[in-house]
């Protein structure tokens, strides 16, 4: 069908001019048809000025048409070689615009990177302050509530109770009445009871070691 359509188109052209159909007419007519979607429109406009391949006159009209129909893509590539460089220039400009857009995007990313780095630096500063505060708190806590501090405090309280009981014993000479004696016994027993309880705690502590949490 394509062969017949091509020949009819050529006959119509030559009929108007009073000329015969030649194989070159077939090739030019075939090259003058609308190209495939991937080929620019300028290929069709400039095809009449495209030189024919060398040795094309050795082929018959049917062979030429079959060759064109079978290898149409190669024909389009051949035609493309003779197009002006405007298409390539347009592509170059398009690529240049794309690169320019990428450059702008990169600058935006660079600014965002600087902001993120600033935030990270602030986070590092906060982390350093937190670590310093935690170390101070831990040190203060250990001084007041650590095993060593608690044991030392217990030892001091035990020693203080022993001293209080010794001082209380010195007041026995000043006891004049039964009521004073009862009060003395009550106070003395209370102090000595607390003293022995704390001594027992210290002994247990020394035996079992530091407290386990």
Curated annotation (Swiss-Prot):
Protein location: Cytoplasm; Endosome; Late endosome membrane
Alphabetically ordered keywords of this record: Cytoplasm, Endosome, Membrane, Protein transport, Transport
Main location: cytoplasm
A GO cellular component annotation in the UniProt record: ESCRT I complex
Effect on the protein of changing residue 185 to R: Abolishes ESCRT-I complex assembly; class E phenotype (malformed late MVB)
InterPro entries: ESCRT-1_cplx_Vps37_fungi, ESCRT_assembly_dom, Helix_hairpin_bin_sf, Mod_r
Protein name: Protein SRN2
Complexes and interactors: Component of the ESCRT-I complex (endosomal sorting complex required for transport I) which consists of STP22, VPS28, SRN2 and MVB12 in a 1:1:1:1 stoichiometry. Interacts with STP22 and MVB12.
Function as written in the Swiss-Prot or TrEMBL entry: Component of the ESCRT-I complex, a regulator of vesicular trafficking process. Required for normal endocytic and biosynthetic traffic to the yeast vacuole.
Effect listed in the UniProt record for changing residue 75 to D: Defective in ESCRT-I cargo sorting
Similarity field: Belongs to the VPS37 family.
Membrane topology classification: Peripheral membrane protein
Any GO BP: endosome transport via multivesicular body sorting pathway
């Amino acid at each position: 069908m394509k062969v017949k359509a091509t020949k009819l188109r050529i006959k119509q052209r030559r009929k108007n001019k009073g000329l015969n159909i030649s194989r070159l007419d077939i090739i030019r007519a075939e090259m003058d048809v609308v190209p495939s979607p991937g080929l620019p429109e300028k290929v069709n406009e400039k095809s009449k000025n495209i030189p024919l391949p060398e040795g094309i006159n050795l082929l018959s009209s049917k062979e030429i048409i079959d060759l064109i129909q079978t290898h149409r893509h190669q024909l389009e590539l051949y035609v493309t070689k003779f197009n002006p460089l405007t298409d390539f220039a347009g592509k170059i400009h398009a690529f240049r615009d794309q690169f320019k857009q990428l450059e702008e995007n990169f600058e935006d990313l660079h600014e965002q990177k600087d902001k993120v780095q600033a935030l990270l630096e602030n986070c590092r500063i906060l982390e350093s302050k937190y670590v310093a505060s935690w170390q101070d708190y831990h040190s203060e806590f250990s001084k007041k509530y650590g095993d060593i501090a608690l044991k030392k405090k217990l030892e001091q309280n035990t020693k203080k109770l022993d001293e209080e009981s010794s001082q209380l014993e010195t007041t026995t000479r000043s006891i004049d009445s039964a009521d004073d004696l009862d009060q003395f016994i009550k106070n003395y027993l209370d102090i000595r009871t607390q003293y022995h309880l704390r001594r027992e705690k210290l002994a247990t502590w020394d035996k079992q070691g530091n407290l386990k949490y």
